[in-house]
């Protein structure tokens, strides 16, 4: 019947691999590789949260259409939360043309870039999860951002109207919007 490899043996090999003298960049690349492999085998492969990757903050690009505005007090609370609790939610992105475009989590990624607080711990990296690959393009990103913002009930009416107008100009029907 062939050799059976146990979870404990796999875990031992991974531990041995990471106990070698390798740089943080190499460790992050290996973590992302292993996570990607596990994600491909996962029964939850269609769920973006099943694969959280670490990417260089310089590869994460803010969108230019987000109608979400955060009050100073809320931003301070988010900063405190990131400092005390760490990142409990990844930045939601769309991977396009070698960049990660922010769909949700603009303020998390902004605070995660800082050289103090949580940003200092992250050493220039940000946790991201990518929206499903078929959701590529500006219209799909905008629609996803709206869904994330409206689910939280935080958005600006005028900015939301501008986005709806832009989606209509891109050929989206009222039903699709």
Predicted regions mapped to residue ranges:
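N-terminal leader or domain-start segments enriched in small/polar residues
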Residues: 1-78, 94-95
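Short active-site oxyanion
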Residues: 97-101
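Short, conserved phosphate/pyrophosphate- and ester-handling motifs at nucleotide-, phospho-/glycolipid
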Residues: 105
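Amphipathic, charge-rich alpha-helical segments that serve as recognition/docking helices
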Residues: 63-89, 109-176
């Amino acid at each position: 019947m062939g050799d059976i490899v146990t979870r404990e043996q796999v875990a031992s090999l991974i531990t041995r691999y990471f106990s070698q003298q390798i740089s943080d960049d190499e460790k992050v690349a290996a973590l992302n590789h292993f996570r990607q492999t596990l994600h491909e085998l996962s029964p939850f492969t269609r769920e973006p949260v099943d694969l959280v990757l670490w990417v260089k903050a310089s590869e994460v690009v803010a969108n230019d259409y987000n109608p979400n505005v955060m009050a100073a007090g809320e931003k301070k609370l988010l900063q405190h939360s990131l400092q005390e609790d760490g990142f409990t939610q990844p930045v939601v992105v769309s991977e396009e043309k070698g960049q990660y475009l922010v769909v949700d989590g603009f303020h998390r990624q902004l605070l995660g870039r800082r050289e103090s607080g949580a940003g200092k711990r992250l050493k220039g990296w940000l946790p991201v999860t990518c929206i499903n690959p078929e959701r590529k393009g500006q219209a799909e990103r905008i629609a996803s951002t709206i869904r994330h913002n409206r689910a939280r009930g935080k958005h600006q009416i005028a900015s939301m109207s501008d986005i709806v107008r832009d989606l209509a100009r891109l050929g989206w029907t009222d039903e699709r919007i």
